[in-house]
Amino acid sequence: MASHQILNEKVIDYSLYLVTGRDLLPPGKSYLESLEQSLKGGVKIVQIREKSVDTAEFLKVARESQILCKKYKVPILINDRIDIALAMHADGVHLGQTDMPVSIARGLLPKGSIIGVSCNNVDEIKAAIKDRVDYVGIGAVWGTKTKELTSPIVSVRGVGEMLNHLNGTHIKAVAIGGIKATNLLRTLHGSVSTSGRALDGIAVVSDIVGSKDPLDASRRLCDIFREFRNALPTSVASHHPYTPDYIKASASRLLEDLKLINPLVQQITNIVVANQSANATLALGASPIMASAPEEMEDLSHVIGSLLVNFGTIKDKEGMLVGGHHANLNKKPVIFDPVGVGATRFRRAAADELLNTWQASVIKGNAGELAALAKSDEVKAKGVDSVGTGFADPGRFVKQLALTERCVVVMTGPTDWISDGVTVVRLDNGNKLLADITGSGCMVGTCVAVFCAAAASSAVQRFEGKLVSGDMLCGAVAGVLALTIASELAAARSDVRGTGTFLPALIDELYNLTAAKIQQYAKIEVVG
Ligand SMILES: Cc1ncc(COP(=O)(O)OP(=O)(O)O)c(N)n1
Ligand SMILES: Cc1nc(C(=O)O)sc1CCOP(=O)(O)O
């Protein structure tokens, strides 16, 4: 989908939208110098926003800015003030919810003027559609110091939901509020509708205006936007026409790769399972680091192969927030295991906060946990366990959740269901003793994290515009297969007489797992 629009024969490119803010200029930097550098760096549309000056000064600044914008063939819009826009023949206006109504502004402005409005929720989007505006400014997507916010933060997942409503319209959408080079890729990947509609641009004040080098700041934002546009349409899908044989071969190869790579797998997990998760990691040929302090997350994010965030006893939320942010920044897979998320309001709110802060590569849970995450009441949970027979159509459910959260979703149970939003895989391995020991679900999360680390580390092709390289669907399938096949082999051993002997045997079978065993025992079906 093109990020530009044709109005009055003019092509409007919203990809990098500068909103001015003279009060944020660094000491010694002149406003016009900063504006020209940002235009050189790739700003494609400018809005003059002056909140605390009189009319004469607003008009002067707008006219001086217009000369530069004309030089770079960039449209100029005026924030709030129709009179200023008319007086200087601006290309259009940006209106807030309490400014001049769109229908009246349209009557006053010359035909073909660009009209954009601020939207903070779905109702405002619906009104903007009725008003046939040219674009919407959705915000604030993150917290910002540039302006005191009077409406709730939308967050990236909220932007995606609002974009769903713009499907089938010609209205363009930019996000605004707290966007900077360090969160831009995350912002873009998170802000996509379930049908794949992405943002047409980003509107930025401080990351450009506050920079001593606005040319470089703008160029960096432009580059990230372009790389995102050039990347594959979903963040993790590799778009291979998956077949059971292909997946089996990939899972087997990943096991061999991981024994060579020996990735470091960081796990923020719960005390109940920490020991057995670390042992499972080692048994597969990876190295565990069970680190949860926020202060160490940045350093670790450079050296880890993947990060597992397991909710379990949820004491380390700050570490989880910071860890996921840095993992995204350094393009390391994040595996999210929202243990017992349906159990309390605190857990539900924490899951939302985490998923609004970083993007998971894989979300893994049982039917009850994933239902709670998706705010579906089709399946109920009791504590950390799922209750009842599960979803009527589990394949459809995981596919939809994968599209909404833009990641791979793994739903564990007697049958495991995995989807990247395009393909749905059904796995039928596993022994019922897994349900009788504590932490087997958490160990699945660990195994998925181990194999996703291998998938990311051994990825042949890297796309700058993706949050993570490598085939996360195959990584997730391989992780589930490893534990479930090992459970079948362990349960069949003559030295296993109950749950007490099953757990060490399970670790043994993970240790002795081979590519040939995966090929021999994996029960895989591609169902959609
Ligand atoms: C692109 C874009 N989106 C939103 C806004 C916010 O406008 P508004 O709601 O009018 O608030 P103020 O900017 O007037 O504080 C914007 N300016 N640009
Ligand atoms: C002007 C403005 N409008 C917002 C909204 O939410 O409508 S947020 C915002 C400020 C954006 O500045 P920065 O890029 O420095 O965070």
Language model features with spans:
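Charged C-terminal helix
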Residues: 216-218, 224, 228-257, 261, ...
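Short glycine/threonine-rich catalytic loop with a Thr-x-Gly-x-Asp
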Residues: 173-177, 210, 431-448, 468, ...
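Charged helix-capping and loop-helix junction motifs
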Residues: 31-33, 59-63, 150-160, 218, ...
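Conserved N-terminal beta1-alpha1 strand-loop-helix module at the mouth
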Residues: 2-92, 98-99, 107-134, 168-171, ...
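Ribokinase/PfkB-type carbohydrate-kinase core domain
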Residues: 40, 244-364, 368, 372, ...
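Conserved post-catalytic alpha-helical subdomain immediately downstream of the catalytic base
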Residues: 192-197, 202-207, 211-213, 448-504, ...
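Active-site/ligand-binding-proximal alpha/beta "capping" segment
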Residues: 129, 134-215, 414-433
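Conserved phosphate/ATP/ADP-binding segment of small-molecule kinases
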Residues: 59-132, 346-426, 430-433
